[in-house]
Amino acid sequence: MAFEIDGKCLCYHGPLLYEARVLRVYDPASQTYRDRTRTGVPLEEEDGLPAESRGREHWFVHYQGWKSTWDEWVGQERIRPYNDENLALKRQLVQDAKAAAAAAKRAKARPGKRERSPAPAAPAAPAQGPRLAVRMPVELKALLVDDWERITKERKLVALPCAPTVGDILDAYYRERTAQLASPVAQTLLHEFVEGVHLYFDQCLSHLLLYRLERLQFDEACGGAAPAASGLPAPPEPRPSAVYGGVHLLRLLSMMPELICGTTMDEKSCHTVVAQCESLLAWMATHADDLVSGDYINTSAQYEGVALGM
């Protein structure tokens, strides 16, 4: 993708697209970036691009109308050209979010009755692969919208560790679903899918699934421990799937089409994975009250200052 300095673009922030302006362009080959007045600037730790993301092209963007504390690096999974097609997608995502919020209010007003009509949850896939979208039950999409508001507007964080964790959720789904499958082939495909989601989550969480406000919390929760006084090596950092829970799993599943379209999977395999994602989402919708924690904690001014300055 080609995005010029000071050029307009659209970026995903949570479930919606926002207008943004490119301030810097990072080149992974040289490990440098350029901005309006400089080229070949070496990337420093304080520039805020995580080490695990430096092997891919990134853009440092400013969201129009937002404070500069929200300026951040985004990868190709989150940035889109500013054109009529993506502006239409931006409007559609807003309409979907409003519909999800309205459905959630209706569901709360009528306990015991759940909305079952699904709604597209994932952004359009990159042009180089098959165009795919995961259809997410509307009540789960409403949870993602609520999650976005809690973090970006109310400056809250999901309470960690979650119960159940992503690992717990995937294990429970596998046990229940595999008991319903008579075919050994179908059981094997299910096992491969669950293991793949588990692996994707652990690998993608830190650089794709977190809001800027959450990164410091991630470092504290999954950054490992300092060596003990005895000089013994620090214990391995916990897998994110053993710390984070349902709402972060929903974030991953909503992005899955883009992630798999960037791989060498053929189109048939991509559609199979999407179908598996939709089956998992349907199961999560029936157990949403138990699987997706609504526990959020307030952040202090000191935490916000450090987290948003990272």
From Swiss-Prot:
Pfam family, one: MRG
Comp. bias intervals (Low complexity): 118-127
Keyword Glycoprotein set for record: no
Residue span(s) of domain MRG: 128-308
Span of domain Tudor-knot: 8-80
Cellular component GO terms held in the UniProt record: NuA4 histone acetyltransferase complex; Rpd3S complex
GO biological process: chromatin organization; DNA repair; regulation of DNA-templated transcription
UniProt-listed InterPro entries: Chromo-like_dom_sf (IPR016197), MRG (IPR008676), MRG_C_sf (IPR038217), MRG_dom (IPR026541), MSL3_chromo-like (IPR053820)
Membrane-spanning parts: none
Subcellular location: Nucleus
Top-rank lineage group of the source organism: Eukaryota
Entry keyword Cytoplasm: no
Signal peptide limits: none
Residues covered by region (Disordered): 104-128
Keywords, ordered alphabetically: Chromatin regulator, DNA damage, DNA repair, Nucleus, Transcription, Transcription regulation
UniProt-listed PANTHER family: MORTALITY FACTOR 4-LIKE PROTEIN, MSL COMPLEX SUBUNIT 3
Subunit record text: Component of the NuA4 histone acetyltransferase complex.
Family: Belongs to the MRG family.
Stated role: Involved in deacetylation of histones, chromatin assembly and chromosome segregation. May act as a transcriptional oscillator, directing histone deacetylases to specific chromosomal domains. Component of the NuA4 histone acetyltransferase complex which is involved in transcriptional activation of selected genes principally by acetylation of nucleosomal histone H4 and H2A. The NuA4 complex is also involved in DNA repair.
Name of the protein described by the UniProt record: Chromatin modification-related protein EAF3
Organism, as annotated: Eremothecium gossypii (strain ATCC 10895 / CBS 109.51 / FGSC 9923 / NRRL Y-1056)
Originating gene: EAF3
